[in-house]
Structures are given as structure tokens and as C-alpha cells.
Amino acid sequence: MLESPPTSRDPGYPRLLGDVGGTNARWAWQAGPGDGPTHVRTLPAAEHASSAECIAAYLRTEGLGEPRRAAFGIATAVTGDRVQMTNHPWSFSITELQRTLGVQHLRVLNDF
């Protein structure tokens, strides 16, 4: 039996992708399955009071809607729900950020 490939209407898309460091937050957008990242932009972390504000600025600047899912690496250990950056003042709850973004799923990983 042949299956058709998923479409951009896949419920897990679009996705917000990121790499967050103490100096910069790099964001990108994945519109659908198999699509490469687009709307790649680097924002200075110091210009934003929180990760949520930085993400909102990215989405607004790029003219993007709400992502369905999000994932980003961050320059600190992720051992539970509360994330505290060691080289920047941002601190957040993964659960609260997921709710704020309105995403179905949020994955935050230590980027080593």
C-alpha cells in the first residue's frame, strides 16, 4: 500500500527552531515536512527581557503566525521544567513558555 507524503497541513507544522546563547538567539521556521529552514534571523539576546519576548519579536519581524511546535538548543543545562541560563539573565519554565507560545509541543535541549 502506498502512502501519500505528509502535506504542509500536517498538524505538527509549522515549527519554530532555535539556538539560544548568551549573546544571540538564532531562530528559523520550518513550514512543512521535508522543508528546510527559512526566515533565519539572529537577534541579540540583550535586547529582549525574556525568551518569550525574543520569540515574539522574531515572529513579528518575519511576519509569521503561531508555530504548532517549537524546539531549541540553549546554552545551559536543562534538568527539569525551570531553565536558568548561566551566561544570560533569562530564566523560564518550559511549561509556561509552551503555554505562552500556544504550541502543541516544546522541546528545550542543552546545546553542549
Residue ranges and their predicted role:
Residues 62-108, 112:
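Short beta-strand-loop/turn "lid" adjacent to the catalytic site in phosphate-handling enzymes
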Residues 2-60:
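Short glycine-rich, Thr/Ser-proximal phosphate-binding strand/loop in the N-terminal lobe
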